[in-house]
Amino acid sequence: MKRTYQPSKLVRKRRHGFRSRMETVGGRKVLASRRAKGRKRLSA
């Protein structure tokens, strides 16, 4: 059986990176809530 997590830096950046978050309204909300919470890292 193949494991579900197959790490890839490129895919990680494209799916969960800052720029991809900024592209959508939902992503912006994610960043806003993480800023409000005071997260050191906002995105991957």
From Swiss-Prot:
The keyword Transferase does not apply. GO terms for cellular component: ribonucleoprotein complex; ribosome. Signal peptide: none annotated. InterPro entries: Ribosomal_bL34 (IPR000271), Ribosomal_bL34_CS (IPR020939). One of its GO terms (molecular function) is structural constituent of ribosome. Residues 1-44 are annotated as: Disordered. Gene3D superfamilies: 1.10.287.3980. Keywords: Ribonucleoprotein, Ribosomal protein. Residues 10-19, 31-44 have a biased composition (Basic residues). One of its GO terms (biological process) is translation. It comes from the Bacteria. Belongs to the bacterial ribosomal protein bL34 family. NCBIfam families: rpmH_bact. HAMAP family: Ribosomal_bL34. This is Large ribosomal subunit protein bL34. It comes from Acidiphilium cryptum (strain JF-5). The lineage of its organism: Bacteria, Pseudomonadati, Pseudomonadota, Alphaproteobacteria, Acetobacterales.
